[in-house]
């Protein structure tokens, strides 16, 4: 049963991590620099599944080391290298998440493939520094029961404690502190968010955007071509004005209680919804607010606008409601989408890291106890 379950886990690990590498390398949407961490982590897991797990299974089933003595030393070094690399990769990913959340604008400009590759190289160097000492200094290999060859890790207390701290306990402590900090930042932002939005809306409502005609120094106006409700008044449409409804805008029919606007005779070009692009950008920064009613032009009847909307009277007697017009609104929505994606990705990584810590903790706890109190803190062999 143990052999069947372990074999299934080996195949599942190789197949799943190979799919991760293939997806990141072939999908254009996954070619972000930070996803290189996932590629390197998947490579470390494949290394564990192919070069370590099969020999560990054979050693466990046979009860002794069946293979060459030289391969035992290489096998132990590879086991420490890959396992340490996998754990330190999770630590590096958590730090990347923290920097992306706490210093988003500054860090995103520095998050280049070259920088990420340098961090990955540092991770592998740390893992190599922890795995190389057993190859250089053999140390005490412990007794060989029944004269059969055994393949065990270095039994020196100094190496057990140093490798356990460097491979697991230090990265684990860093990950816990980092994700605690991320949680506090997210909690503070969520608590501050409604107040900040309320303040911006209050400030925006104090700055009316009248729809009045005039020169460029006056409040923006509805254009003459858009102010003529031709079909409502029964007049013919001016030539060349058909089909000029702005794209990407929702269109609703003009209510009957809205009076038609006469031709103002002005041909100046204005922004969509009768306001200039500058005023549109200012309005987007403050959030979508209601525009107070004001005269459309000198001598024209008042144009009452529904609260919470921006309108555009077209030639066909319709009202066009804008959907996030302006560069500021687009940037705001992109930023909000990016933050939502970052939060979701951070939550998924927190779950993955938590599961990995729980899986590794029993081994490193028992391994460290063997060095701290070797005679009174023995762990039963059947535990693993």
Curated annotation (Swiss-Prot):
Organism: Echinops telfairi (Lesser hedgehog tenrec)
Sequence similarity: Belongs to the G-protein coupled receptor 1 family. Adrenergic receptor subfamily. ADRA2B sub-subfamily.
Membrane topology qualifier: Multi-pass membrane protein
Protein role: Alpha-2 adrenergic receptors mediate the catecholamine-induced inhibition of adenylate cyclase through the action of G proteins.
Pfam families in the record: 7tm_1
InterPro entries reported for this sequence: ADR_fam (IPR002233), ADRA2B_rcpt (IPR000207), GPCR_Rhodpsn (IPR000276), GPCR_Rhodpsn_7TM (IPR017452)
GO biological process: platelet activation; regulation of smooth muscle contraction; regulation of vasoconstriction
Membrane-crossing residue ranges in chain numbering: 1-25, 37-62, 73-95, 118-140, 157-180, 349-372, 382-384
Comp. bias intervals (Low complexity): 288-306
Disordered as annotated region, ranges: 193-306
The protein's name: Alpha-2B adrenergic receptor
Lineage: Eukaryota, Metazoa, Chordata, Craniata, Vertebrata
Cellular localisation: Cell membrane
Record-level GO cellular component terms: cell surface; plasma membrane
Assembly behavior: Interacts with RAB26. Interacts with PPP1R9B. Interacts with GGA1, GGA2 and GGA3.
Listed GO MF terms: alpha2-adrenergic receptor activity; epinephrine binding
Cytoplasmic side: 26-36, 96-117, 181-348
Extracellular side: 63-72, 141-156, 373-381
Alphabetical keyword list: Cell membrane, Disulfide bond, G-protein coupled receptor, Membrane, Receptor, Transducer, Transmembrane, Transmembrane helix
Disulfides per UniProt: 72-151
């Amino acid at each position: 049963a143990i052999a069947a379950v372990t074999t299934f886990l080996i195949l599942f690990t190789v197949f799943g991590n190979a799919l991760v590498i293939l997806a990141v390398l072939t999908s254009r949407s996954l070619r972000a620099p930070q996803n290189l961490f996932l590629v390197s982590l998947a490579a470390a897991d494949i290394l564990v599944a192919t070069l370590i797990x099969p020999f560990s299974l054979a050693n466990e089933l046979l009860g002794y080391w069946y293979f060459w003595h030289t391969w035992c030393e290489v096998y132990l070094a590879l086991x420490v290298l890959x396992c340490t690399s996998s754990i330190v990769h999770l630590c590096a990913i958590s730090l990347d998440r923290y920097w992306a959340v706490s210093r988003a604008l500054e860090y995103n400009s520095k998050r280049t493939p070259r920088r990420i590759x340098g961090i990955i190289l540092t991770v592998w160097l740390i893992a190599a520094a922890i795995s190389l000492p057993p190859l250089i200094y053999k140390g005490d290999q412990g007794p060989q029961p029944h004269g059969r060859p055994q393949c065990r890790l270095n039994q020196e207390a100094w190496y057990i404690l140093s490798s356990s701290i460097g491979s697991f306990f230090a990265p684990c402590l860093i990950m816990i502190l980092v994700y605690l900090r991320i949680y506090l930042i997210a909690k503070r932002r969520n608590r501050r968010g409604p107040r900040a939005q309320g303040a911006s809306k209050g400030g925006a409502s104090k700055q009316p955007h009248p729809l009045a005609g005039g020169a460029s120094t006056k409040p923006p106006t509805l254009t003459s071509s858009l102010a003529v409700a031709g079909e409502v008044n029964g007049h013919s449409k001016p030539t060349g004005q058909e089909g000029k409804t702005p794209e990407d805008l929702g269109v609703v029919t003009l209510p009957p209680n809205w009076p038609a606007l006469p031709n103002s005779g002005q041909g100046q070009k204005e922004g969509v919804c009768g306001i200039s692009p500058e005023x549109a950008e200012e309005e987007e920064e403050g959030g979508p607010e209601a525009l107070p009613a004001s005269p459309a032009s000198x001598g024209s009847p008042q144009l009452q606008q529904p609260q919470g909307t921006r309108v555009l009277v077209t030639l066909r007697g319709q009202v066009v409601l804008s959907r996030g017009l302006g560069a500021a609104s687009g940037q705001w929505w992109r930023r909000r989408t990016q933050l939502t994606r970052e939060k979701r990705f951070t939550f998924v990584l927190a779950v993955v890291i938590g599961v990995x810590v729980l899986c590794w903790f029993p081994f490193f706890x028992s391994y460290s106890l063997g060095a701290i109190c070797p005679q009174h803190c023995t762990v039963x062999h059947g535990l693993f």
